Amino acid sequence: MILDTDYITEDGKPVIRIFKKENGEFKIEYDRTFEPYFYALLKDDSAIEEVKKITAERHGTVVTVKRVEKVQKKFLGRPVEVWKLYFTHPQDVPAIRDKIREHPAVIDIYEYDIPFAKRYLIDKGLVPMEGDEELKMLAFDIETLYHEGEEFAEGPILMISYADEEGARVITWKNVDLPYVDVVSTEREMIKRFLRVVKEKDPDVLITYNGDNFDFAYLKKRCEKLGINFALGRDGSEPKIQRMGDRFAVEVKGRIHFDLYPVIRRTINLPTYTLEAVYEAVFGQPKEKVYAEEITTAWETGENLERVARYSMEDAKVTYELGKEFLPMEAQLSRLIGQSLWDVSRSSTGNLVEWFLLRKAYERNELAPNKPDEKELARRRQSYEGGYVKEPERGLWENIVYLDFRCHPADTKVVVKGKGIINISEVQEGDYVLGIDGWQRVRKVWEYDYKGELVNINGLKCTPNHKLPVVTKNERQTRIRDSLAKSFLTKKVKGKIITTPLFYEIGRATSENIPEEEVLKGELAGILLAEGTLLRKDVEYFDSSRKKRRISHQYRVEITIGKDEEEFRDRITYIFERLFGITPSISEKKGTNAVTLKVAKKNVYLKVKEIMDNIESLHAPSVLRGFFEGDGSVNRVRRSIVATQGTKNEWKIKLVSKLLSQLGIPHQTYTYQYQENGKDRSRYILEITGKDGLILFQTLIGFISERKNALLNKAISQREMNNLENNGFYRLSEFNVSTEYYEGKVYDLTLEGTPYYFANGILTHNSLYPSIIITHNVSPDTLNREGCKEYDVAPQVGHRFCKDFPGFIPSLLGDLLEERQKIKKKMKATIDPIERKLLDYRQRAIKILANSILPEEWLPVLEEGEVHFVRIGELIDRMMEENAGKVKREGETEVLEVSGLEVPSFNRRTKKAELKRVKALIRHDYSGKVYTIRLKSGRRIKITSGHSLFSVRNGELVEVTGDELKPGDLVAVPRRLELPERNHVLNLVELLLGTPEEETLDIVMTIPVKGKKNFFKGMLRTLRWIFGEEKRPRTARRYLRHLEDLGYVRLKKIGYEVLDWDSLKNYRRLYEALVENVRYNGNKREYLVEFNSIRDAVGIMPLKELKEWKIGTLNGFRMSPLIEVDESLAKLLGYYVSEGYARKQRNPKNGWSYSVKLYNEDPEVLDDMERLASRFFGKVRRGRNYVEIPKKIGYLLFENMCGVLAENKRIPEFVFTSPKGVRLAFLEGYFIGDGDVHPNKRLRLSTKSELLANQLVLLLNSVGVSAVKLGHDSGVYRVYINEELPFVKLDKKKNAYYSHVIPKEVLSEVFGKVFQKNVSPQTFRKMVEDGRLDPEKAQRLSWLIEGDVVLDRVESVDVEDYDGYVYDLSVEDNENFLVGFGLVYAHNSYYGYYGYARARWYCKECAESVTAWGREYITMTIKEIEEKYGFKVIYSDTDGFFATIPGADAETVKKKAMEFLKYINAKLPGALELEYEGFYKRGFFVTKKKYAVIDEEGKITTRGLEIVRRDWSEIAKETQARVLEALLKDGDVEKAVRIVKEVTEKLSKYEVPPEKLVIHEQITRDLKDYKATGPHVAVAKRLAARGVKIRPGTVISYIVLKGSGRIGDRAIPFDEFDPTKHKYDAEYYIENQVLPAVERILRAFGYRKEDLRYQKTRQVGLSAWLKPKGT
């Protein structure tokens, strides 16, 4: 039996060690032959020599590839050739892998992250824990001396206890007279004795409880202090302590260190995980707890040492018993996974699945996919609809049964770009195949074995469930629908199939092996035809050396292109370098956006001239590619390819047309005649239209640049498949069908884009859950695989899975499913709920959590670069309502993928602030506990139990869920934020367009006549001419130049080119509105137009034109519609938001008057307000304490940007993204207007607006101010600032805020010693420089000094029940965002193995197909049992349902259920099987996944109900148990209600024994770290004040007394309760213990909380609920 493996280094080479137990003896085997390696996939095998030369450095040693080997592997089922690269040492791999991956010839590298010893187990097929060896186990535990404030391991170890099959003993160094105690002289001797015991007993397994994080570390520290060699390994080595996440893990070489704590934490849900609590939960027996202070007291006084020794012995004994209980399951898991028990017991479920698949992949010669990087992770985090859940039939039911459930042959021809017509079996991932839209990239190639019938349709052979599109027509429309191949055999398919007559022509053309030189010559000729010139010039000059005149013959080749056409420029350069060995010079053409590439060499000129003279004999596709890249464009409006030439170049268009005709590409040419400067001109246009022409161009020619190819692909996808009978690319064909038998490989392709491609010239379509995976062969390598005989198609989602051979995952799941069934049988046999949970854990691979935020939380979000503050619930609800058709559902979770949204976030590695894209919005229906987390700074956030904030552990930020956060914890908040910064221009037109039309009735726009006379009409005539509707105006050139300035057209030497037809069309609409509505205002020599008359068009006016206009009221003030947002405007806005007021009121003439007032008592401030207001709004009024802007335009501006009332004031959104000076100016104006200096010298900003308070925090963070606190009193929010701001100086020293210190707890955790106070960054640096702090450890905290994140302390955590929607975001890369009042960093949400985004074999299509089949089978089965067998289904979830026959007795229900099973299982396919899971006498169902049932043996099973926890009072537990029994055992709802009323009555009359009211809660941290004082903390603090030692782990047992004031003040230790003096608080126990324990259960029967109290007893009309519905 293999226990473990590792490796050591000998002479620089690795040696594998295998620790084994064989025939009862321990042995170590060595393997010196195994070499580290990984795989590399190369573009070209010739590059392997370059790869072999790559070097790196590791600790001064040069790392190289030792040797290489070419191997045949499969990647997702598809054969692939890769290079296996071997190295000298395992540590060489991480040193060199990135350099190899970055080599341009390397496509990717694989399996580089598998640890060497684990790799050895996989490659050699070795399975740990396999065999029948009996393992010797030894458990141990230590007791230590501790005084409050001491550093870890400062106190000595007092006792070491150990236990094995022979019993338990204790070693100590004080005299204790007990038979199982061995007494030695000193602590040193005690440890040496223990080491001797381990050596003599030589256990294979060392069992601890939290030994990873306590016992071993303590022993190691004490051994170092006492000079003891802590040798526990069988090779004489000391235990190896290594970090594993935020915890530690300890290895003992040659022995299995089995730490029970991580195993139990992941398998059993308990309120506390003390050894005592776990032992009682597992074995049902109590165990005495002796607290640390009691141990210390006993040791120092010598009294009660026997009790401590007994406690120590029992610790070792129960640890041994727990080890025996849990080790067999972990050993079984180790055998299944194929990795060591040490690894398996500390691994997450996802990692276990991964290691299992890695081993199986190697066995099947499959190359393992790489783990996703952060970018791929973000792409994967998408949701899909979950399993079917039927809403329950509420009430009490009898005689219930529960039933539950157990996916183109190789010579098919396809056209591949660059390869021509090949067999589908030869296609590789990354190839481009001929599809419905031309070339489409192959994402995956699937290969399977198949044996069975193929359907032959016109020569295309496919499996029966393969789909082909079929076209049917009637008088009105053409319809294209997919039909299964097997349907063609039934003659039910009416219509024609789609083929292409060009299949073989395109295949032949793309397969032509044209030499690169011919391709380059053709492209060069086409480029010169479009954009080039050949220049030959004779220049006479005087040769001074020879004293005579000479002639210089100059030859030059020039090509002029756009400056931004980088790909085109690079291609031209490449052509000249490859053909002529010369690099062209590049120069910019002044005043243009063009560059010219030049070569001035005679020999090059002559060669190029020869090429051009023979252009028609060159490779036509290459010539056309060059020409269209230079002079062609994709017209986005017409979705066509257009090339245009001027008057003298008709021959070029004719030549291009001739070449296109040779290739069979349909096109049109036409001539456009016009006059320019009195001369007749012609423009010759060639256009390729229609989907057929575009596809032929794309497949046979294509563009050079990716940009133009992308535009072409988009145009193709937007083109409809019209006129299929008369089409250059598609044809409609009748079909003939037959069948034949086939045995062999079948293939499928997964494509990017539309899932159709041509095969043989015919267009072709591209738990319960484990059982479905096996039945339907659901696997990444069977998904949408072309060429199979048979497919299973997932309902609704339409993904196809090849059935011709077993997929990688399904074939493995068969074994797992069999194992699962064995486990389920054991689960049925056990009556122990803990064992059930443990076994249930083993059959699950993934647990999906709903982690969310409450709807009212504030969220800053950037949309198109603008900052918005919204309630997270309002944002997500609105967007999901607006995009209802795009919302995906996964069970109770709704997901909407979005674009254009960003949120502030921090980089998890650097802790720097960043903006990150929001991938999806998430909404989840939730019922359960929610936690309001309040921070010391005044921030607060409300989250569900599973949602995470970021807290610090061992110097690193880690995710901590809501139910784990406690007062005193430190959580991440922003120090500073990086927002996009740019100069803004306030556009009043856009602002006014957002106001109601009635508000802009008297708003006008004006422009001076000068320079604009007749301009509007002239421009409109020119635009109509451009669109071919009028003759060319005489003055067209003037307007064309204006259009060129605006970027709509480009003028040429002759004529012009329209750059953007869509925008030009909109611009024309603007001028049609202006010409119709502009009038001349002679008094002011201006043109005037009413704003509302052009409201529909004015928004598209170019800014260059808009800045010439004025805007305002007809008879009043007008101003520029474009206002630069500078510091003056920002300060004015700050004044307004703080103490401004905008007013609209009726005037004496029954009209409206508008004004804006800015208030202040300081004359100097009023002077500044007046100066700023008059700058923007002209003349203003000055009052005693105000400045008034009596302008409507001013009112509209301030109202729309900033709000009116104090409660709805806000910061204009553009302020956040303005330059820092502008943001500071706003803050200065705000501070002067509504700020003050608090008596403690803090700056204070005040507002009644909660939104504004949050905005102020964000704005302050954006200028680097982090010392912010928030308060709220008398309806006013206060923002306190403890930093200097540029506009205010304070002379008093301030107390440091959280953002200015490193918390002492963090320092203690990192440096391992006690710090008495927090430390400033300056002091911290000095301590490091002075050598007082370890620099290496200090580096772990560098992010707290240099990063953009600081720590804020949790002050209180309040818990409440919640029913409703909760919300979350999926954020790219960083997985966090800012949310909550005052802004807190929250972790974003994660969404069995297929859907796990971090999985190597991730497959979203597989996951959603499995759930789709699940929904189909469960709904079909429910329909069958109800309609044919008379059952009523009461409740169902994803993989089973509860049903009964109303009125039938138990035996009838059982009999009919068995008959139905026989019937339905004959109909269900494959491994799917409906099972008889159990019969229940009675049950009730509350809501989804919340129910309780009782079986025939009286065993009650509950799911999802609020079952009381172990730390609730006995009266609550007892009442709930009695209520469940009354409902389920007696079937009596009235009795259940009576029980509750009786208990509440007894409580009210003080008739309940006090011992039933004791509440037990555990202290989880040092008392000084508790800021919020719950009852147990209040009691603990009072005990501590009396000298009682309280440590983390201490359980406080208390009772709450009647009285006034806080509950904590009325809670006392139970042993102090005196019935003669004290009365318990009956109301507290009723409201907080008894009613919560039963309320949710009885709510299912129509009862409310008030109905259950004896004081409010009343009859309710609930007779329908009171009788069992099954009777």
From Swiss-Prot:
Residues 524-665, 1132-1265 form the DOD-type homing endonuclease domain. GO terms for molecular function: DNA binding; DNA-directed DNA polymerase activity; endonuclease activity; exonuclease activity; nucleotide binding. The keyword Phosphoprotein does not apply. Pyrococcus kodakaraensis enzyme is a very fast, thermostable DNA polymerase (130 nucleotides/s) used in high-performance PCR. It comes from the Archaea. DNA polymerase optimum pH is 6.5, very thermostable, has a half-life of 12 hours at 95 and 3 hours at 100 degrees Celsius, for protein cloned without inteins in E.coli. Disulfide bonds join C788-C802, C1403-C1406. It catalyses: DNA(n) + a 2'-deoxyribonucleoside 5'-triphosphate = DNA(n+1) + diphosphate. Undergoes a protein self splicing that involves a post-translational excision of the intervening region (intein) followed by peptide ligation. Its EC number is 2.7.7.7, 3.1.-.-. Coiled coil: none annotated. Gene3D superfamilies: DNA polymerase family B, C-terminal domain (1.10.132.60), DNA Polymerase, chain B, domain 1 (3.30.342.10), Hedgehog/Intein (Hint) domain (2.170.16.10), Homing endonucleases (3.10.28.10), Intein homing endonuclease, domain III (1.10.8.1330), Intein homing endonuclease, domain IV (1.10.10.1010), Palm domain of DNA polymerase (3.90.1600.10), Ribonuclease H-like superfamily/Ribonuclease H (3.30.420.10). This is DNA polymerase. The lineage of its organism: Archaea, Methanobacteriati, Methanobacteriota, Thermococci, Thermococcales. The gene is pol.
